[in-house]
């Protein structure tokens, strides 16, 4: 409501809008060093979990992660990070795109086709040898990254390249034959093939053309590897809105239905005519991902497509790879909040994107660039990485959850809790371009700075003493941005300084003991704003 007010009230006669007035007041306060006091009292959250109510843990966030254009996987530094991510976070699938490109030695013209599978083999061999399943995006996704998101990016694509797949049936046949021969049909049948239709940036290809391309690929591939999963179309509900249902209805009438329907989630408003021109396109909705999933399921139901799984193949808090919030603990809290909030709703949630190497550019000479990756170019784990790591520590059974936490157990009296104190962005954020947010002033963009007192009551516990170990990543610990600040935002880091940061970007740990009484164990913890915690509980 606050936000509405600020946007609607025109300010005084000077013609300034309320946000500008606010900015001036704030600049005055900042320059005169008036600090808003940290709110003393924190809000309280209680979660009751029950060991008798255990359900198997479905690790849908661990199923797939976006890696980048196939050509990146020929690089040593990217491979090293992929190996690290497989070893530490054990993703089952990795999603790659742009496998049909001249850099990959595959040239699909309208009439003349030249191709050599040598480089593609190197990429897929690398993944398969690491026991990573490929999730391959066949659409011609451009290798672009954005500094900020505005309407101009909707006009980038004018390429009908998807149709080239239809014109090259012989090539598709060679490709799938080559794969089944090289990797064996059983292996290839575990792969996912996705065909993007209208990504965040709309392509100029009609629905009819899309269906024809999809059916061409589907028929040829299923002929050689019947079990391979082929779906699409990378829908962004913020772009197509209600027409999603109509597209699905038409798809249902076609010869082949997709094995899965895929959507993307990036919180932007494209449809709404944003009245106040001072605003960026960011959607202010705090549960954006949950709403998109809910809406997509609702429309799939109306279209009679309830038996087809819905996959979120890309999700992030932003499309910008020059937004310093990507490097901050805001991002880790955002991720944990969303992974808990959407638990059990979709089989796959593919985070965008694994590494900052994806978003390199000529403008990049800073140590932290505001990229969407889990890891920096110099192999330092960002708070976003620890969001995944903490969630991965959840035990095989889930015994309780609420909006701030999820509690898990295993058979032998070991428990793991993952919790967060996410703070949403406020109206100031919407008046800024994403690449203009100052690393020192992030605080100004959050709804509040209150800490959270959480209390977990776990029922049906054995009597006796338990050890509690709390790992935390937050504004002052394990946070690469904060550690870099201690080094005076030094631009060019030596190997020694990079190693120093690697050692310091780790969760902090505190340990204490609690006693279970009346078959109930109560654990209390205090969580700072934008902090995440992983809590291990074990019988002593």
Region annotations inferred by a language model:
Residues 49-52, 72-86, 178, 241-251, ...:
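Short, acidic/polar
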Residues 81, 268-323, 338, 344-356, ...:
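Glycoside hydrolase catalytic-domain groove-lining segments
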Residues 2-30, 166-242, 256-262, 301-319, ...:
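Active-site region of glycoside hydrolase catalytic domains
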């Amino acid at each position: 409501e606050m936000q509405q007010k600020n946007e609607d009230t025109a300010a005084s006669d000077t013609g300034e809008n309320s946000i500008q007035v606010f900015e001036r007041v704030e600049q005055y306060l900042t320059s005169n060093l008036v600090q808003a006091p940290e709110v003393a009292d924190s809000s309280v959250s209680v979660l009751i979990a029950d060991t008798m109510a255990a359900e198997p843990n479905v690790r849908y966030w661990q199923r797939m992660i976006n890696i980048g254009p196939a050509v990146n996987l020929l690089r040593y530094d990217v491979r090293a990070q992929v190996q690290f991510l497989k070893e530490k976070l054990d993703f089952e699938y990795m999603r790659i795109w742009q496998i049909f490109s001249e850099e990959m030695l595959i040239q699909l013209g309208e009439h003349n086709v030249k191709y050599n599978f040598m480089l593609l083999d190197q990429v897929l061999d690398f993944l398969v040898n690491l026991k990573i399943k490929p999730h391959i995006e066949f659409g011609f996704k451009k290798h672009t990254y954005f500094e900020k998101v505005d309407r101009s990016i909707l006009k980038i694509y004018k390429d009908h390249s998807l149709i080239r797949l239809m014109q090259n049936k012989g090539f598709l046949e060679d490709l799938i034959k080559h794969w089944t021969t090289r990797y064996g049909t059983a292996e290839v049948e575990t792969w996912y093939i996705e065909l993007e239709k209208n990504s965040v940036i709309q392509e100029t290809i009609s629905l009819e053309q899309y269906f024809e391309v999809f059916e061409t690929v589907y028929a040829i591939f299923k002929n050689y590897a019947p079990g391979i999963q082929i779906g699409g179309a990378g829908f962004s509900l913020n772009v197509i809105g209600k027409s999603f249902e109509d597209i699905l209805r038409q798809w249902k009438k076609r010869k082949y239905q997709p094995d899965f329907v895929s959507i993307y989630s990036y919180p932007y408003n494209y449809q709404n005519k944003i009245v106040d021109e001072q605003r960026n396109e960011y959607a202010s909705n705090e549960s954006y991902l949950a709403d998109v999933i809910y809406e997509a399921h609702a429309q799939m139901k109306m279209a009679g497509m309830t038996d087809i799984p819905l996959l979120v193949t890309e999700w992030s808090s932003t499309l910008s790879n020059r937004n310093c919030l990507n490097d901050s603990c805001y991002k880790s809290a955002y991720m944990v909040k969303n992974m808990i909030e959407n638990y059990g709703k979709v089989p796959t949630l593919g985070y965008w994107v694994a590494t900052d190497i994806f978003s390199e550019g000529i403008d990049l000479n800073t140590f932290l660039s505001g990229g969407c990756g889990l890891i920096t170019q110099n192999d330092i784990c960002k708070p976003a990485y620890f969001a995944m790591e903490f969630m991965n520590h959840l035990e095989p059974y889930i015994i309780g959850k609420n909006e701030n936490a999820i509690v898990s157990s295993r058979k032998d009296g070991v428990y793991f809790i993952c919790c967060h104190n996410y703070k949403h962005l406020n109206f100031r954020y919407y008046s800024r371009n994403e690449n203009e947010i100052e690393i020192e002033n992030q605080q100004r963009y959050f709804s509040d700075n209150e800490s959270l007192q959480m209390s977990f009551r776990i029922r049906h516990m054995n009597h006796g003493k338990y050890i509690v170990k709390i790992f935390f990543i937050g504004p002052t610990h394990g946070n690469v941005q904060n550690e870099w600040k201690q080094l005076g935002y030094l631009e060019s880091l030596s190997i020694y300084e990079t190693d120093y940061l690697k050692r310091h970007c780790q969760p902090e740990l505190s340990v204490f003991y609690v006693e279970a009484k009346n078959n109930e164990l109560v654990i209390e913890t205090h969580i700072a704003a934008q902090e995440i915690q992983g809590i291990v509980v074990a019988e002593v």
